[in-house]
Amino acid sequence: MIMTKKILELIRETSSSLPDDVLKALKAALRKEAKGSSAAVVLKTILDNCAIAKKRGTPLCQDTGTLTFFVDERLRRKVTPNVLKKAVALATAKGYLRKNTIDSITGKSYDDNVTEGAPVIHYVDRSSDSRSSSSSGTSSPTVTLVMKGGGSENMSRQYSLPDSTLGAGRDLAGVRKCLLDAVQKIQGYGCAPGILGVCIGGDRATGFEVAKEQLLRPLDANEESGIRNEELRKLEKRILKEANTLGIGPMGLGGKTTLLGVKIASRPRVPASFFVTVAYMCWACRRRTIELRGQGPSGTTKNAKKRKAL
């Protein structure tokens, strides 16, 4: 029951409070816009909404999204699917989550948000990830929750290169054309300003999995060289800069900030395939981690830190 309460609190905080890096990016975006402009009004409204939601402990957005848990493999016996599902049902009953889970065949609503495949649960090996270590140097297992709304999920897409309609070949120049096309097609439908999580390569399923995991990476992370490809680092910066010159702006109403961040990873591919997969996240980038130290279930809740790919 203690663990269920901790997961319940993780859900409440994730639903009602944005991570610090996302709030910082939204505030920086507001400072760039002309006072009284549509973009400034939208961003100010978003930030006011965030403050109210955090104060009241209520959802940031009416669409509390698909809940995806990433659970350290070392916690498998403590943080079981049953524990997670009980916490989700309690969170729904308390109003931290809306009734948001529908049977795709019958249209029936699962009013507690619990059924086969809901919530989404991944047990992952983090034991060798030095970035999950505590300040004392000991590795602490974690549970990360991501809540992704339907509006942003609908804007995710996948390209297959070469793409003659875009004039995109099988190289980073072609990848760039795909990503800027994705931003143009999203416009205001995905509740901009948003974040792009990208996977270059892999098969179709792996592409979406890895692209979505990029959304766990903090926007303001000073990621050390050697961990990631320098070419991808440069491409992230270029896409962010170019996307923010398109004039799409917050909610597609015009402005200087269309994207808050771009995070790109790559995976090997077979010669016959070259996929570019885009996982789009709206401004309500709800992600949070609970860190469980020691043998007992005590833990501290913190914003999700950078993760290595599954």
Enumerate the predicted regions with their spans:
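Short, low-complexity, charge-dense intrinsically disordered segments
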Residues: 130-134, 298-310
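Non-transmembrane, aqueous-exposed alpha-helical and coiled segments at domain scale
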Residues: 1-129, 139-198, 203-299
